[in-house]
Amino acid sequence: MYLQLLKSLNRLHPRAWDFVQLSRMDRPIGIYLLLWPTLSAVWIAGNGSPTLANVLIFGLGVVLMRAAGCCINDFADRKVDGHVKRTADRPLASGRVRPREALALFAMLVGVSFLLVLCTNSRTVWLSFGAVALAFCYPFMKRYTYYPQVVLGAAYSWGIPMAFTAAGGELPASAWLLYIANLLWTVGYDTYYAMVDRDDDLKIGVKSTAILFGDADRNIILTLQLLSLGCLLLAGSRFDLGGWFHLGLLGAAACFAWEYWSTRKLDRESCFKAFLHNHWAGLLVFIGVVLDYAFR
């Protein structure tokens, strides 16, 4: 039904679907992966009772900034996507959208996101510039470093400190444990994603942690995921989170174990499924946070 609604936009404009695909609104997995840790931070920062305004601001902000990130990503990769089987039909690579149109959509999405941030406070507004900088820089990093996933992790985690400053203006040191946990988790699942394209990336000179980790890829991903859980466990103790939160962490650990087992053959399909599966890990942690506050 969601996709049918998006496709109906073509009735308004014949090229609407091209821009839906450019912003990946037809593939909401990236929204979920960004949304759950951000909302977890909103709940913790609000001590279990976040304001409706903050929930809406950060929820909509996630959707808009993820879409903006996809636009600038495809702009940066427009000359290489055509050489990768999975991305050859993207709107920019196939010529259905012009580069300046992608930049215009990126600017528009960032502008609307900034209007949302203006509804918070000055410290959160200043932090938002870091979010835009990271979102813009990430897609270009894969040309120069084997650690673009770390930059993505920094970008995908930036909503966490913003959630705390929006809730009360203060940024406790413990909030950075949540930030580090999410960064490690993001590097892990995006490495699974990069493993899908590893053979193509090697041919065209695109760098990634999947290439850097080589044969140790799955073991390093699992290590990153366990370190992420450790940071969450420590953060939970600092924020007085208890049993329900710990159950959420156990659920996430089960997800990580399944991903490790399911990718043992290193085929593209299983690596892509492992990437998608991380949505459930993030959701379980978020549910654990919400229930822990709800049943106090």
Swiss-Prot record:
Disulfide bonds: none annotated. PANTHER family: 4-HYDROXYBENZOATE POLYPRENYLTRANSFERASE, MITOCHONDRIAL, PRENYLTRANSFERASES. One of its GO terms (biological process) is ubiquinone biosynthetic process. Keywords: Cell inner membrane, Cell membrane, Magnesium, Membrane, Transferase, Transmembrane, Transmembrane helix, Ubiquinone biosynthesis. Pathway: Cofactor biosynthesis; ubiquinone biosynthesis. It is a multi-pass membrane protein. The chain crosses the membrane at residues 28-48, 52-72, 102-122, 145-167, 174-196, 219-239, 241-261, 275-295. Belongs to the UbiA prenyltransferase family. It catalyses: all-trans-octaprenyl diphosphate + 4-hydroxybenzoate = 4-hydroxy-3-(all-trans-octaprenyl)benzoate + diphosphate. This is 4-hydroxybenzoate octaprenyltransferase. InterPro entries: HB_polyprenyltransferase-like, Prenyltransferase, UbiA_prenyltransferase, UbiA_sf. Its main location: membrane. Catalyzes the prenylation of para-hydroxybenzoate (PHB) with an all-trans polyprenyl group. Mediates the second step in the final reaction sequence of ubiquinone-8 (UQ-8) biosynthesis, which is the condensation of the polyisoprenoid side chain with PHB, generating the first membrane-bound Q intermediate 3-octaprenyl-4-hydroxybenzoate. It holds the Pfam family UbiA. GO terms for molecular function: 4-hydroxybenzoate polyprenyltransferase activity. Its EC number is 2.5.1.39. GO terms for cellular component: plasma membrane. It is found in: Cell inner membrane. Its cofactor is Mg(2+).
